[in-house]
């Protein structure tokens, strides 16, 4: 522990306030914002595709729940990133964006990111049940029950936000470095009683969901391997066996892709939260504040990436998604062409009337 503390003490002075601001501009204002804009469009498309396919099965309902949490996560993180844009901060507005974003951007994003993790854990668990109890799973996890479970996930994960919103609000305060009185983050006199509680609860939710996804995915991969081997041995028709084998491999690749995306993108956040708990002064008000903020901004890149690339997974692995996706854009293209043709005809008609 002493060695770890010494390491952080040697690193922290290297990050000055000016350097921290540069890191925040690059990671938040540039990188995360760009990825987030793509993700917003991608998740809107995901939602439209799943609605067109129909929300009459537990799989589509689960994916819809994931798309909604991803969309809300990206909306809040986009606002968070805008709040650190120097042009916005120095504009003539009556509030200080880095202060206001805590309750309107940063904290809600943390909540929706945890919801995404738990919905992913549920989807992985559901797939695990499908391969373990294929004949009973449709009776166990009906569309109605899946919807109730997703609503429960949203509700439970939102509960840790209560202590934060009960002891903090947006109000007028004086900013000495600006020599202005602006709207900013203000704490109540009861703040000390719950300080850090929301952060702790979100950390616990993140660790548990992270482990749950890893465990369920590992079980699913093992079960798929067993099922694939059993089918190859027990099926006499080689062509049918090959079809089953391809289906199993496709499902396995989907699971591996989903697990890899989640594990890779959440690993930096897991390391970040671990550092907060084991390294003294590595927090928003501690000696290593700048290092804390730079690390948090770095983690936001991966949060944004995780919520933005699901459309690639669906499009690559699901032929049904690809078909609906192509139908959707074909419809949009036909409408555009029809609109352009109608405009041209109206223009020609107007020109003819003018000549007459």
Model-based region annotation:
Residues 1-42, 85:
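Extracellular N-terminal segment of 7TM GPCRs
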Residues 8-17, 87-111, 159-208, 281-283:
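Loop architecture of class A 7-transmembrane GPCRs
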Residues 69, 186, 219-271:
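Intracellular effector-coupling site of seven-transmembrane GPCRs
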Residues 1-15, 226-252, 285, 319-356:
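Intrinsically disordered regulatory tails of 7TM GPCRs
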Residues 21-33, 59-124, 130-133:
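Extracellular TM2-ECL1-early TM3 structural module of rhodopsin-like
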Residues 72-76, 83-86, 108, 112-122, ...:
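Fourth transmembrane helix
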Residues 2, 32-36, 72-92, 113, ...:
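Helix-to-loop junction signature of class
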Residues 212-213, 261-264, 270-274, 294-344:
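Seventh transmembrane helix
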């Amino acid at each position: 522990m002493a060695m770890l503390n010494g390491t952080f003490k040697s690193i922290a002075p290297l990050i000055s306030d000016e350097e921290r601001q540069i890191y925040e501009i690059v990671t938040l204002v540039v990188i995360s914002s760009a990825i987030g804009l793509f993700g917003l469009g991608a998740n809107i498309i995901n939602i439209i595709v799943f609605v067109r396919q129909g929300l009459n099965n537990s799989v589509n309902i689960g994916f819809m729940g994931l798309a909604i949490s991803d969309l809300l996560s990206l909306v809040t993180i986009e606002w968070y990133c805008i709040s650190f844009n120097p042009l916005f901060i120095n504009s003539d507005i009556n509030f200080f964006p880095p202060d206001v974003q805590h309750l309107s951007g940063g904290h809600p994003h943390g909540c929706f990111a945890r919801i995404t993790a738990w919905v992913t854990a549920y989807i992985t668990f559901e797939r695990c049940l499908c391969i373990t109890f294929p004949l009973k799973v449709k009776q166990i996890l009906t569309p109605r029950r899946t919807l109730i479970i997703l609503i429960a996930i949203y509700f439970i994960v939102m509960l840790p936000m209560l202590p934060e919103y009960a002891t903090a609000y947006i109000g007028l305060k004086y900013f000495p470095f600006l020599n202005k009185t602006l709207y900013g983050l203000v704490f109540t006199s009861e703040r000390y009683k719950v300080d850090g509680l929301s952060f702790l609860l979100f950390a616990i939710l993140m660790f548990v969901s992270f482990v749950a996804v890893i465990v369920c995915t590992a079980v699913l991969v093992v079960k798929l391997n067993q099922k694939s081997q059993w089918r190859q041995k027990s099926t006499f028709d080689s062509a049918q066996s090959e079809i089953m084998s391809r289906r199993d491999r496709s499902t396995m690749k989907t699971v591996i892709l989903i697990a890899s995306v989640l594990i890779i993108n959440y690993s930096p956040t897991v390391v970040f939260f671990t550092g907060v708990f084991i390294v003294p002064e590595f927090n928003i008000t501690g000696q290593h504040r700048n290092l804390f903020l730079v690390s948090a901004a770095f983690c936001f890149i991966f949060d944004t990436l995780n919520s933005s690339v699901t459309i690639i997974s669906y499009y690559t692995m699901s032929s049904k998604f690809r078909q609906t996706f192509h139908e959707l854009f074909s419809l949009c293209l036909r409408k555009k062409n029809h609109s352009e043709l109608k405009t041209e005809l109206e223009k020609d008609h107007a020109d003819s009337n003018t000549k007459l």
